[in-house]
Each structure stands twice: as structure tokens, then as C-alpha cells.
Amino acid sequence: MNLKQALIDNDSIRLGLEANNWKEAVKVAVDPLIESGAILPEYYDAIIESTEEYGPYYILMPGMAMPHARPEAGVQSDAFSLITLQNLVVFSDGKEVSVLLALAATSSKIHTSVAIPQIIALFELEDSIARLQACQTKEDVLAMIEESKDSPYLEGLDLES
């Protein structure tokens, strides 16, 4: 699963969206994947239920969340969406987020061995959250992903398959 290609294939980069709370933020993050057929609507419900039970375990760094649920919760194909919000939303643990990268993985192996390294590579770029917030076009986001491809986290990964 290639982050850049998955975002292109699913037309799932959305910038400057509005959300009044964390549930709306998760909804606008997964909507592009529902629209593309990568996930079923119940995937959203599974994320909400899991968040309410375990807290927002998918906030990976200040300002950024990677909402996801288990593969059997409605994943049809491997996919990502990346959205930015106009305003910060506060999650149940008090953490604020303005960038969400939703992940749909058909297996836990893809999640840990392929998806996570690409996400780390992107978000380890200097000022990644501010830079993503400043992106005006999908092409701006894709250029940042391209910039991240030299990350040591991606060494040895076959991102073309």
C-alpha cells in the first residue's frame, strides 16, 4: 500500500474542512473512503465505539490523529485519507488535532509493516503539521509525501506493489 497512490486512487485529500467536535472530525476524515468504496459506513461507527471505550489511542503526535479500526470492521480495500481542519478539535483526552490521516488496512500486517512507516516518514518532516495546514492544493500535499520518501523508515519497503 503506497500512501501517495492510495490518496490519489481514492481522491481522499481534503483541505480546510470544518468539524465542530472530534466525532465530526473523524467523520470528515473517513467520508472520502466511504465515497470511494474502500470502507463501509460501519467503519466510522467502529472508530467511534473504540474511541469511546479506549480513548483516542490514534493521536500519534500533537495536532495529528490517525483514526482507524480493525480490518473486519468494514474495510474493503487498503486506503488512506488525509484531511486538514480549519480549526482544532479537542478529543476526549484534551488533545487538540487539526490533521487527520485515516487508515483502512485489510490486515494488521499491512497496518504495522507498510502503513505506519509511511505515516512516520511524512510526519517526521520538519514542521509537518504546520506545513500540511498551509497546503492549498492536493498537489501540495502530494509534494510533501514525495519529499518524505527518502526517510530511513522506508528503507527496504516495496511501496510499488
Regions inferred by a protein language model and the residue ranges of each:
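Cytosolic covalent-transfer regions centered on His/Cys nucleophiles
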Residues: 1-161
